[in-house]
Amino acid sequence: MKEKNSNKINEDKLNKKSEVKNKKEEEIINNKKQTTEKKINLNKNNISDEIIPEKINFNDQKNIIENLKKNLSKEKKSKHDLILRNQAEMENLMKRTQANIEKSYKFALEKFSIALLPIIDNLERTKNLLEKENEKNKNINPIEEGINLTLKEFIKVIHSFGIKEIDKKNIPFDPKIHEAMTVIDDKNKKTNQVVEIMQKGYILNGRLLRPAMVVVSK
């Protein structure tokens, strides 16, 4: 009888232990389940927040599109204006460069031409002296012929470079191209007329190299 009771007690103890163990296991499983469910719910909420967009305001969208169009139009106009300005600057630069080249060429030619003028003056003086000498002797001087030929070639060359003489008489005095060396009273001439050329003047491409030295009537 005692043995039976003892066995029963032992069984009860084992059953209680088993029940306690099972409860603990159930609690652990429930806790894990609850934790997992919470995580799933949190993830769902996050996904929902990310996926579901805010309510769209179509008026704002229209305003944004209109502003973008205006900005794009302004940018296009600005770029177009910039291109036009650059083209104008390039054209002006080319014109200035061409003008500077021409100016440099004319300036170099001007200096060279001015250096030639005394040579031409000396040839003309020599020619005039020889002509007067030959009139007295009534002889043909070969030196005179050589001087004449040389002078003709010089004149031909300077004409080819755009140099022209100022040597006309009986025209109105012009202070822009004439320098009055003396004034004479001549009743046969109009007042302020070029009566005589003492030294020729020269013009290069419309620009005065040297004024003509003249005698003027009064």
From Swiss-Prot:
**What name appears for this protein in its UniProt entry?**
Protein GrpE
Repeat recorded as keyword: no
**Stated role:** Participates actively in the response to hyperosmotic and heat shock by preventing the aggregation of stress-denatured proteins, in association with DnaK and GrpE. It is the nucleotide exchange factor for DnaK and may function as a thermosensor. Unfolded proteins bind initially to DnaJ; upon interaction with the DnaJ-bound protein, DnaK hydrolyzes its bound ATP, resulting in the formation of a stable complex. GrpE releases ADP from DnaK; ATP binding to DnaK triggers the release of the substrate protein, thus completing the reaction cycle.
- Family in the record: Belongs to the GrpE family.
This protein's record includes keyword Chaperone: yes
Q: Where is this region: Disordered?
A: 1-32
Q: Name one GO cellular component term.
A: cytosol
Instruction: List the GO molecular function terms.
Output: adenyl-nucleotide exchange factor activity; protein homodimerization activity; protein-folding chaperone binding; unfolded protein binding
Q: Which PROSITE patterns match?
A: GRPE
Instruction: Enumerate the NCBIfam families for this protein.
Output: PRK14150.1 (NF010748)
Q: Which domain of life is it from?
A: Bacteria
GO biological process annotations for this chain's record? protein folding
Recorded hits in SUPFAM superfamilies, A to Z, give: Coiled-coil domain of nucleotide exchange factor GrpE, Head domain of nucleotide exchange factor GrpE
Keyword annotations: Chaperone, Cytoplasm, Stress response
Cellular location(s):
Cytoplasm
Could you give the subunit structure recorded for this chain?
Homodimer.
